[in-house]
Amino acid sequence: MEFEKLAEFAKEKEIDLCIVGMDDPLVGGLVDVLEDAGIRTFGPKKNAAILEGSKAFSKDLMKKYDIPTAGYENFTDPKEAIAYLENAKFPIVLKADGLALGKGVLICQNFEE
């Protein structure tokens, strides 16, 4: 994303306040770029937006600080994930890490799903 161009545009048009609401630009750091350019901005900075952008990060953070959350496992190796699912209790909720526009959650009733 070309955040610097957005900052230039906002300065040229003398925009008083930018409200950043979409996940991708928030996680990408648009708020940081706009604020660094001296533009008043409403929205979380990149280091806070990661809470929305990475469920794995969020869950790990909750676990670290004893914040109640549903049980979870993180996998980077598909074979390990499959091995886990072979012995898992169903139904089970699966979510790939990262942004999916609210559509990245699967509720599987059995291993085949």
What is the role of each PLM region?
Residues M1-F9:
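Glycine-rich, highly charged phosphate/nucleotide-binding loops
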Residues A10, E14-I15:
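Proline-aspartate-enriched helix->loop->beta-strand connector
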Residues M1, L30-L34, I92-L94:
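N-terminal glycine-rich anion-binding loops that anchor highly charged ligand groups
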Residues E4, V27-G28, Y84:
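Short, basic phosphate-binding NTP loop
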Residues A7-E8, D32, I82:
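Alpha-helical segments flanking ligand/cofactor-binding loops in enzyme cores
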Residues L51-E113:
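Active-site nucleotide/adenylate-binding loops and adjacent lid/helix of ATP-dependent enzymes
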Residues F3, I19, N47, F90-P91:
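Sparse, context-dependent recognition of short Cys/His-centered cofactor- or disulfide-binding micro-motifs
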Residues D16-S54, D66-T76:
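A short, GP-enriched loop/loop-strand-helix hinge that lies immediately N-terminal to
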